[in-house]
Amino acid sequence: MGSEMCIRDSMNIEKLSIKQIKDLMVKECNDELLTAIKNDARKGVQSIYKSYQREMKERQRVANLYTFENGCRANGYKLIAGVDEVGRGPLAGPVVVASVILPENFFIEKINDSKKLSEATREKIYDIIMKNAIAVNRAIIDEKTIDRVNIYQAAMNGMYEAIYGLNPKPDAVLIDAMPLESLDIYHQSIIKGDAKSASIAAASIVAKVERDRMMNEFDKIYPQYGFAKNKGYGTSEHLEALRKYGPCEIHRKSFEPIKSMVMQK
């Protein structure tokens, strides 16, 4: 009560402790209080102000990631799914496609294209998504299917599977780049969508985390290839292991240089 009276009385926050100011920020943050904090020279108070500015900047960044979703809602669509795939480029392992329906304008700190995030941040956001999403689904396309139908078709098939397996069903779908011409749900294909849409970013994170976990398990079975580190991508160490040991069961036999290795046998 005393603190509130003091704040109301000409914003005399210099009489308040750092803890009291933090508590007040939670209870009644307003322009007058922010101005008083900005003008308080104490280092601790300035730290509070800078932290608040960072949080507001992050909240605005995340809010901007819902531009496509809110555009869909303005046209009457309620359940908007984001879809993305991970693993088209590696020489080994599956393609993983994920689809995610997030609550409307749900704030997830640091959400972004999974490639721009550290492993620890991806894991943290993954847990938030799995706990709070309206729906999550994923499709895993193994290396044998990739070799049989080609990587582009495999990824496309995975997207259809991930979308149609959602429960509840989406009203609209936001897709990272790939056109899905046969999809009978309203959809938009967005170039670099995982950096422009929160729903697509969430899907990219789910797909990335789950594929990385799979490659970590494959590393235990085939330790010579370093899958836990390279995730199946063609690093110099991985290529050297291929030359030394040849391909293993999860290598994509239709990808070079593995295709040539198999043909030479």
Model region roles, listed by residue range:
Residues 1-7:
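Short, small-residue-biased leader/transition segments that mark boundaries at the very start
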Residues 8-81, 88-265:
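RNase H-like, Mg2+-dependent phosphodiesterase core
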